[in-house]
C-alpha cells in the first residue's frame, strides 16, 4: 500500500517498523480528499521526509503538507515535484538506509513515469 488512507497507513506503518536500516528517507505526498492528519499520525518520527506533490490537480501543496507534518513532529524539506524529492532522498541515503515513496498513488505513478 502507498499509505493513501488510514487503513493503508496502519498496515504500512507495521511494515516500515519491521524494516532494518540505519535511517529511513520518506518521499511523501497526498491528495486533498484524504485524511491527511490521520495518515500523518501513523508515520514514523525517526525518518527524514521529502514532502512533495504529484502532477495532479488534487495534490496537496508540498509546503502545506510540510506544515501539517511539522505539527506531528515529522521533519523534512519540501520539493515541487516527485523527481526532485526522490533525487534528494537518493542523494542523502547511505547504502544501509531505506527510501520509501508513497502517500498518494499519484506520487508513486509520477516516480514510475519520471524516475525509473
What are the language-model segments listed below?
Residues 2-48:
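Nucleotide phosphate-binding/pyrophosphate-handling subdomain across enzymes
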Residues 28-32, 52-54, 103:
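Cofactor-binding loop segments of dinucleotide-utilizing enzymes, especially the Rossmann-like FAD-
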Residues 104-116:
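Glycine/aspartate-rich loop-and-adjacent alpha/beta segment that forms the canonical ThDP
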Amino acid at each position: 500500500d502507498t499509505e493513501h488512507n488510514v487503513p493503508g497507513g496502519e498496515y504500512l506503518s507495521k511494515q516500515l517498523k519491521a524494516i532494518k536500516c540505519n535511517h529511513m528517507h520518506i518521499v511523501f505526498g497526498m491528495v486533498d480528499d484524504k485524511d491527511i492528519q490521520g495518515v500523518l499520525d501513523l508515520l514514523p518520527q525517526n525518518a527524514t521526509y521529502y514532502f512533495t506533490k504529484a502532477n495532479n490537480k488534487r495534490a496537496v501543496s508540498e509546503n502545506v503538507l510540510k506544515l501539517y507534518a511539522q505539527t506531528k513532529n515529522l521533519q523534512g524539506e519540501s520539493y515541487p515535484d516527485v523527481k526532485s524529492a526522490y533525487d534528494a532522498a537518493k542523494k542523502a541515503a547511505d547504502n544501509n538506509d531505506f527510501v520509501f515513496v508513497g502517500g498518494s498513488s499519484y506520487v508513486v505513478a509520477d516516480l514510475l513515469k519520471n524516475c525509473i
